Amino acid sequence: MALLVLAAHARRAGWEPRVIDQNFQKLPDEIPDLACLTVWTSIAAQAYRLADAYRAKGVPVVLGGVHASLIPIEALRHCDSVVSGEADTIFGTVLADAAAGKLQRMYKGSFQDMDAVPMNHEWADILDKWPIARYAPLNTLQTTRGCRFNCDFCSVIRINGRGSRHSPPERVIEEIKVLKKVGQHLGEFAYVFFLDDDLAADLDYCGELSEAILSSGVKVRWGAQASIGLARNTELLATATRSGLRTMFIGFEGIDRDALVECNKKNRPGEYGELVAKVHKAGAGIEGGFIFGFDSQGPDCFEETAKFVDNINVDVAHFSILTPYPGTATYARMLADDRITTFDWKRYNMYSCVFEPAKMTAAQLETGLATAYREF
């Protein structure tokens, strides 16, 4: 979605952007005037190869995204410029410098209000041409940026800041209507997933948005990542489900306090079952995220967690391996302790072990992950 938003900025600046998602599309044969790539850690090597190939053809390259933002010195070996952080406020300058042949090595974005971000009607035609638009079961929106939590394994606040900036509810309604037109193949009740890191970071806003969807009359089923606070608030949960909430992804992360303390998470495992039951009673499903590899966990954690998750009736479980992503407190701690075993970024995928676990081997951790999925 980030590239689509930047495409809108490029159009405003008089450029003719073409957005390519390599999950679904082949690269065009045409040589562009400028190549802009967004880089996640797990695809960094692939992005660097592509950037090198474009530069070999004389095409200037700009890299952005989480990985390039947090390891710019590495990224700069493969590009002309790095844009660090949110690019919205600086991308116009980047394009102007590119047109003048005067790209700077580094650009630093700054935070801005969400109502200043281009709305999706400015790039919906691009999305409508993508192959995914013909068969995807959902469309996506972002209503907030930032997070009020500070989990050790997460880099969100390094990129989007602490706290929550959100779009006016009426703006979100208009964007839902645009997505319903793009996704006409989905029928009357389109499904929208809010990409926010925590839609419930501001419970008042979550309530206002739910009420706005209800009062607008727009028919939509929606899902979101949300912290446990939404499940605790019975009245708000009821309003959200009436407005169309059907799926909540909650990062439970662990079932024992030691693991949660280690990652600076304030969840209370003893209430998980009650909260899942409340969400089900309200009419929504639960996708739960659980992480393996914390120092307090031994080889018995996989079956224990799978049984626990099954007993509390989580609908879909997402098990993963603790991954020390650059820019996180987990990365800094493991790097200082010389526990990181590889910097092969493609292995930073949440399913491979890239560090030395405290109470098991790396092989046990990877095998245990598969065990948890089988047991659940």
Q: What are the language-model segments listed below?
A:
Residues H121-G289, F294, E303-K307:
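Radical SAM [4Fe-4S] cluster-binding motif and immediate context
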Residues V39, I43, H67, V83, ...:
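Structured beta->alpha junctions
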